[in-house]
Amino acid sequence: MALSPRDTTKRRAQRVRTRLRKVANGRPRLSVFRSAKNIYAQVIDDERGVTLAAASSLEGEKKDKGSDKDAAARVGALVAQRAIEKGVKDVVFDRGGYLYHGRVKALADAAREAGLNF
């Protein structure tokens, strides 16, 4: 029985998260969600089930396009700034089954430059 592309993506993302939980050692998870028009990131404490910091490309000026690498870099810097304000410096990067390329990579690089360690 063949799986649909959507089911395959969901299973891959779940597999990645399961591996991350084994490696995390209590560190929060920087989770990325990418849509066709926007990108979202949040720092999640899985032990308590709480979102510590979040940012998306919907924030800010409406005229800016939210689907390019510049928007992803802004989101990465913003979520890193908010996480550091909450006292979180070390995280585990959860790319959510997306390839580490393009917007996902731009978000991760900006978060690293803003001070998050992963």
UniProtKB/Swiss-Prot annotation:
InterPro entries hit by this protein: Ribosomal_uL18_bac-type, Ribosomal_uL18_bac/euk
Keyword rRNA-binding recorded: yes
Keywords assigned by UniProt, alphabetized: Ribonucleoprotein, Ribosomal protein, RNA-binding, rRNA-binding
GO cellular component: cytosolic large ribosomal subunit
Pfam families associated with the record: Ribosomal_L18p
GO terms under biological process: translation
Family in the record: Belongs to the universal ribosomal protein uL18 family.
Subunit structure: Part of the 50S ribosomal subunit; part of the 5S rRNA/L5/L18/L25 subcomplex. Contacts the 5S and 23S rRNAs.
Role, per record: This is one of the proteins that bind and probably mediate the attachment of the 5S RNA into the large ribosomal subunit, where it forms part of the central protuberance.
Protein name as annotated: Large ribosomal subunit protein uL18
Source organism: Phenylobacterium zucineum (strain HLK1)
Lineage: Bacteria, Pseudomonadati, Pseudomonadota, Alphaproteobacteria, Caulobacterales
Gene: rplR
